[in-house]
């Protein structure tokens, strides 16, 4: 039987029940799909979790990846497994915390082409 394990790397969610729901969440809007060509997707981040996921897959070996889940004040959920999006989001959150700037904050997600990317490019997250 394949093993699936989720650990929380970083979060501002304090309620255990909500955090348990987030760890099992697969029903979210994909941030990458919401970014229009040449534009950005603006969202209001109130709660978030960065998850480290380990999945043993029988045919192709183990797969380790991270997932970002963001919840806005209306309860809409957005997510991505883009490493560049997760890294820029985490850096932004750390900066907000160091300057004592509370959530919610309007943020935007946008795509940038890179030397190594074919097609879509990197997803980055910044303040709106």
Locations of the language-model features?
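GIY-YIG-like beta-to-alpha core
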Residues: 78-91
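OB-fold/S1-family single-stranded nucleic acid-binding modules
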Residues: 110-128
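Beta-strand-rich binding-surface signature
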Residues: 67, 106, 121
């Amino acid at each position: 039987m394949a093993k699936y394990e989720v650990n929380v790397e970083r979060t501002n969610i304090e309620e255990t029940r909500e955090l348990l729901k987030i760890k099992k969440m697969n029903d979210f809007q994909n941030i990458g799909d919401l970014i229009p060509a040449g534009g950005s997707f603006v969202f209001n981040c109130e709660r978030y979790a960065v998850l480290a996921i380990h999945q043993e897959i029988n045919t192709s070996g183990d797969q380790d990846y991270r997932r970002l889940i963001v919840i806005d004040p209306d309860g809409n959920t957005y997510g991505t497994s883009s490493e560049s999006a997760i890294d820029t989001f985490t850096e932004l959150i750390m900066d907000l915390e160091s300057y004592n700037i509370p959530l919610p904050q309007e943020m935007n997600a946008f795509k940038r082409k890179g030397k190594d990317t074919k097609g879509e490019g990197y997803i980055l997250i910044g303040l709106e």
